Curated annotation (Swiss-Prot):
TM ranges: none
Protein's name in the database: Variable large protein 21
Sorted UniProt keywords: Cell outer membrane, Lipoprotein, Membrane, Palmitate, Plasmid, Signal
Note, other: Genes for both Vlp and Vsp families are on (usually) unnamed linear plasmids in B.hermsii HS1.
Role according to the record: The Vlp and Vsp proteins are antigenically distinct proteins, only one vlp or vsp gene is transcriptionally active at any one time. Switching between these genes is a mechanism of host immune response evasion.
Topology in the lipid bilayer: Lipid-anchor
Keyword Transport: no
Length: 364
């Protein structure tokens, strides 16, 4: 009986040892975390941007995914009631820094392609040409983002005080913001991104509610009245961030001035951002909603800007309008940046693949 039990135990021990050996072999065949291998495969877009660009088998879409991974900790910034204008500046600087990193990755691709090539022949390298063209666009965008990073101050986004008049933005900083936004849009258009259309909706929509008094939160000569912040919020619901951005960049730098007469359908976001007399600002029911909304966004983001508010904690309502306008504009700018980078990487990837694709013997 004891011999039989001993034999059974020995067989169990042998079986357990064999299972352990099999498990150890299996574990040894697994790729390490974060690495690719025959046993693991590679996820779409994995690898650094430079690696994806240099691998002929990877698509342009993979390159864009690698870029999105690079900027994933920066994209999607949203201003809140506690967000300072300079915090938004930090977001712009961070996004610009990521474009700088992408540019460095591109440079690495060019350097790798030039290994073993005489300097005199390097200028004829199609990969270097493709990289230089892409870097030029990315560096231009970075410059404009860096500029946007300096136009704010330590006050909250959409800054407002209870039962108080608003304050005009610093005109020099407003011009800087305008130039940067226009530069981003022009660069994007040069890279094949469609320019957004300016919204034509007026502050009075058809025969419906007239929200022209919403412009009074941009008054610099007196507090807003009851309901003005609500009408400003209603104006924002009628326009998109893209329409606001288009309205801003379709302005001209010389429009960064105080409004001294009644507004018209031609009054620009830059003028609304500087503001003026409340009666002048709210005089025309045909003022463009995108212009008023763009002005609110700029007032909320640029140094010195402050929104007017009524009493009874109306400053919270005015600030809420400013934050909404600012976030709409930020989303539009970020979207334009992403589309531009996507187009740039697609073009660069195509040229790089063409240069590295093996040619038939007769075409060597």
């Amino acid at each position: 009986m004891r011999k039989r039990i001993s034999a059974i135990i020995n067989k169990l021990n042998i079986s357990i040892m064999m299972m352990i050996v099999v498990l150890m072999i299996g574990c040894g065949q697994q790729p390490e975390a974060g690495k690719t291998g025959a046993a693991g495969g590679e996820k779409q877009g994995a690898g650094s941007l430079s690696e994806v660009l240099m691998e002929v088998g990877k698509s342009a879409e993979n390159a864009f995914y690698s870029f999105l991974e690079l900027v994933s900790d920066t994209l999607g910034f949203t201003a809140k009631s506690t967000t300072k204008k300079e915090d938004v500046g930090g977001y712009f600087n961070s996004l610009g820094g990521k474009l700088g990193e992408a540019s460095n990755e591109l440079e690495q691709v060019a350097k790798n392609s030039e290994a073993g090539i005489e300097k005199n022949d390097a200028s004829k390298n199609p990969i270097r040409s493709a990289v230089n063209a892409a870097k030029k666009t990315l560096e231009a965008l970075k410059g404009y983002l860096d500029s946007l990073g300096t136009v704010g101050d330590s006050n909250p986004v959409g800054w407002a005080s209870n039962n108080a008049q608003g304050a005009a933005v610093d005109e020099a900083e407003l011009k800087k913001a305008y130039k940067a936004l226009k530069g981003i849009m022009d660069t994007a258009e040069g890279a094949g991104v469609a320019r957004p259309e300016v919204g034509n909706i007026a502050v009075k929509v058809g025969n419906g509610t007239d929200n022209k008094d919403g412009a009074k939160i941009l008054a610099t000569d007196g507090a807003a009245a009851v309901g003005d912040a609500g009408k400003a919020a209603a104006i924002l619901t009628t326009v998109s961030g893209k329409e606001m951005l288009a309205s801003i960049v379709n302005s001209t730098e010389d429009k960064a001035v105080k409004i001294t007469g009644n507004v018209t359908v031609e009054t620009t976001p830059l003028e609304f951002a500087v503001g003026g007399n409340g009666a002048h600002l709210s005089q025309n029911a045909n003022s463009k909603a995108a212009a008023v909304a763009g002005g609110i966004a700029l007032r909320s983001l640029v140094k010195g800007g402050k929104l007017a508010a009524d009493n009874n904690d109306d400053d919270k309502a005015s600030q809420g309008v400013g934050i909404t306008a600012a976030n709409k504009l930020l989303v539009a700018v970020e979207d334009i940046i992403k589309k531009t980078v996507k187009n740039v990487l697609e073009k660069a990837k195509g040229e790089i693949d063409k240069a590295r694709d093996p040619k038939p013997a007769g075409q060597q």
